[in-house]
């Protein structure tokens, strides 16, 4: 459980009560005493996913998903980063023989065992599962019940036998993100009944397979790994029925959807996005942990990362990860970062975004400080003014600010009034004196605990878009970004109504419908956007992080698109 720190030795009882209420909004629900399995799950923290390798949809782990072949050195380097557990997703579909035996290729099963052993040798807790099989064929269970169940049972019979003598630091997850809609049903109760049948069958197969499997930790997922209350309650009922002390519940979490993909104007880590974390994990805690069932978040991240990690602005993304990590820690829930190759390079063993990893790593031991923004904008050709930001100190104390190793002077270069940090106009003028559009300097802010927070000082001018023509499959607006960065785009028909996909909002999904190409000097409008745009005129509003808004008009006629600058 996360402990709050205070610089005061004595606090009034009223303040103590208020703090406890803030930390435990559902504290009225008394928690069950910690179990051995709860201690096991807490020892797994932090965890990492070896995504898009053995779970590749295809016959070769290196071909279908583009990642290099797993090496022992990779596993050792993950352990060296401080991770205590690893989830190794495995897709079996292309490696299973025909009915009735559904024999798994010996070479593939041995390969899985090899990777598992490397992880165990690195002193990691290890989770293996049945991964993309969930949507490849298990999802057809309603229409192909007997075949799916026989195949599923055969897989787990062979896995259980292969690993029955492995130590208890190896756990089995029954199925990843189980779903059954390909069978024809969308009925929640029917889907839950099929999942319950799979989970119970999995449980019985493993428990009756001998060796260490009689007590091996088993991980059971909600329907689609979703943390909705209905689905968690259903899983709780299944686990209660099984009455086994070595069970772990799992859900996945990718944040409040509009923020996670950058749609509907949710460009910032705001109160609604934060409250989504609070509500979700209060419910997870009260459904499972408080009743003696430990929980691991088997995957977490942001959905926009599937496109690229720049879909969410850097500072906003850091605030999400910081708050998420500390809140689930309060709830005694362990987490496993989803990494399909976008975070930790599997040959150089370097993080693609060291600042993101530093924020995640700092969360393992405490809280980090953040700010209302990580961007300080100075408009070219205008009088520079003092600029203030709000610090989210999170119980910490600011210790220094520096640029390129030179410490800034309090009172001269900046002032700090409680948690309000003000950068003086004289310092901002100095930092942007070269007149280069874009990031001119990075102010590194250090605190007594946690990760550093970096402010990028940006010199910008109003972005300029130019008229152009193109097609629905290839349309790019020539853009002079002038040091600014794009936050979002609105699309509205001139005659009224929202244009493009998700027409319940005028703000379109970043990268899916539009994409800034800074190095090319373009804003690309994607085919997916035009697929749902009528043949008429659309007004676009491009909103930038400086606060600038630039209007643009497009006219679609069949596959032809004409763009006109305002």
Swiss-Prot record:
It catalyses: Endohydrolysis of (1->4)-beta-D-glucosidic linkages in cellulose, lichenin and cereal beta-D-glucans. The keyword Magnesium does not apply. One of its GO terms (molecular function) is cellulase activity. One of its GO terms (biological process) is cellulose catabolic process. GO terms for cellular component: cell surface; extracellular region. This is Endoglucanase B. Keywords: Carbohydrate metabolism, Cellulose degradation, Glycosidase, Hydrolase, Polysaccharide degradation, Signal. It is an enzyme of class 3 (hydrolase). SUPFAM superfamilies: (Trans)glycosidases, E set domains. Pfam families: CBM46, CBM_X2, Cellulase. Its EC number is 3.2.1.4. The active site is at residues 177, 299.
């Amino acid at each position: 459980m996360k402990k709050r720190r205070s610089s005061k030795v004595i606090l009034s009882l009223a303040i103590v009560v208020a703090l406890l209420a803030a930390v435990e909004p559902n504290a009225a629900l008394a928690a069950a005493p910690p179990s051995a399995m709860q201690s096991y799950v807490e020892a797994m923290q932090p965890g990492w996913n070896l995504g898009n390798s053995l779970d590749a949809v295809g016959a070769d782990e290196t071909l279908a998903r583009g990642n290099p072949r797993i090496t022992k050195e990779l596993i050792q380097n993950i352990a060296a980063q401080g991770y205590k557990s690893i989830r190794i997703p495995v897709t079996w579909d292309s490696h299973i023989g025909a009915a009735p035996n559904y024999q798994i290729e010996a070479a593939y099963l041995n390969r899985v065992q090899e990777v598992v052993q490397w992880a165990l040798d690195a002193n990691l807790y290890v989770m293996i599962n049945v991964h993309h099989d969930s949507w490849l064929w298990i999802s057809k269970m309603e229409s192909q019940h007997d075949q799916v169940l026989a195949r599923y049972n055969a897989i787990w019979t062979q896995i259980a036998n292969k690993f029955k003598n492995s130590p208890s630091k190896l756990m089995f997850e029954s199925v990843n993100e189980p779903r059954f809609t390909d069978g024809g049903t969308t009925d929640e109760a029917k889907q839950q009944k099929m999942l319950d049948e799979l989970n119970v069958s999995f449980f019985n197969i493993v428990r009756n397979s001998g060796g260490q499997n009689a007590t091996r930790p088993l991980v059971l997922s909600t329907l689609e790994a979703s943390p909705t209350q209905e689905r968690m309650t259903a899983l709780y009922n299944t686990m209660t029925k099984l009455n086994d002390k070595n069970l772990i519940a799992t859900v996945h979490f990718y944040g409040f959807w509009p923020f996670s993909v950058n749609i509907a104007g949710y460009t910032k880590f705001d109160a609604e996005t934060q409250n989504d974390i609070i509500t979700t994990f209060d419910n997870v805690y009260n459904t499972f942990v408080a009743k003696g069932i430990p929980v691991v978040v088997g995957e977490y991240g942001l959905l926009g990362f599937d496109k690229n990690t720049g879909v969410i602005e850097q500072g906003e993304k850091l605030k999400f990860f910081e708050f998420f990590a500390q809140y689930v820690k309060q709830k005694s829930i362990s987490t496993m970062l989803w990494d399909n190759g976008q975070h930790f390079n599997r040959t150089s063993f370097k993080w693609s975004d060291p600042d993101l990893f530093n924020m995640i790593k700092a969360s393992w031991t405490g809280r980090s400080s953040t700010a209302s923004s990580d961007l300080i904008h100075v408009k070219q050709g205008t009088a520079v003014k003092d600029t203030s930001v709000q610090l989210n100190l999170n119980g910490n104390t600011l210790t220094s600010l520096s640029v390129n190793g030179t410490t800034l002077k309090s009172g001269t270069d900046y002032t700090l009034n409680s948690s309000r940090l003000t950068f003086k106009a004289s310092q901002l003028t100095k930092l942007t004196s070269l007149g280069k559009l874009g990031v001119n300097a990075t102010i590194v802010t250090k605190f007594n605990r946690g990760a550093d927070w970096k402010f990028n000082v940006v010199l910008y001018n109003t972005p300029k878009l130019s008229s152009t023509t193109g097609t629905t499959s290839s349309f790019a607006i020539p853009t002079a970004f002038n040091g600014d960065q794009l936050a979002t785009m609105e699309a509205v028909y001139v005659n009224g109504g929202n244009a493009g996909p998700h027409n319940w909002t005028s703000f379109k999904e970043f990268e899916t419908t539009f994409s800034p190409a800074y190095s090319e000097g373009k804003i690309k409008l994607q085919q997916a956007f035009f697929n749902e745009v009528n043949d008429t005129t659309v007004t676009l509003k491009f909103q930038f992080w400086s606060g600038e808004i630039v209007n643009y008009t497009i006219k679609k006629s069949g596959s032809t698109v004409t763009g006109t600058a305002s």
